[in-house]
């Protein structure tokens, strides 16, 4: 079963995300599918299929939706669980590209027995601007910060253009 369809107390992760988006008045929702796409049957959602899902990463799936990325857009990875305060912070940003990240991320990895820090998608922040998102280790200058990418990106109309033109 795709991770986004995992049931948690009677609701899938994706259903939880969609419910929260609707609470914020976001009703135009597109979901890019891949593995077991026939299992995605939620209503009021438009589905797009990434035929190369097994050989690509999330960015390629996002590019499947490239034509839908115009104007103000919110991109949420389908397999993440988040509090609505994180969504609220991202939505309230006036930046062209706002990325949800956890600057205290290393603490949560220290408490884990398997400690898979190397698997975390890291965000490099220079002067309050995101300049890189990478699963690789990021070299850090003293003035910069590194956070863990939380799988939520808000794009303004200009941010959408920047993303789709690159």
Annotate each language-model stretch with its function.
Residues 1:
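N-terminal nucleotide-binding beta1-loop-alpha1 segment
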Residues 6-7, 11-73:
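Conserved N-terminal catalytic core of the sugar/cofactor nucleotidyltransferase
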Residues 10, 44, 79, 127-128:
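Residue-level detection of beta-strand-connecting loop/turn positions
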Residues 33, 77, 101:
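Short beta-strand/turn micro-motifs composed of small residues
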Residues 36, 52, 80-81, 104:
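Short, glycine/serine-rich, charged loops/turns that create anion-binding
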Residues 71-81:
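Short beta-strand-to-loop acidic/aromatic patch adjacent to the donor-nucleotide binding site
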Residues 84-165:
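Conserved core of the sugar-phosphate nucleotidyltransferase
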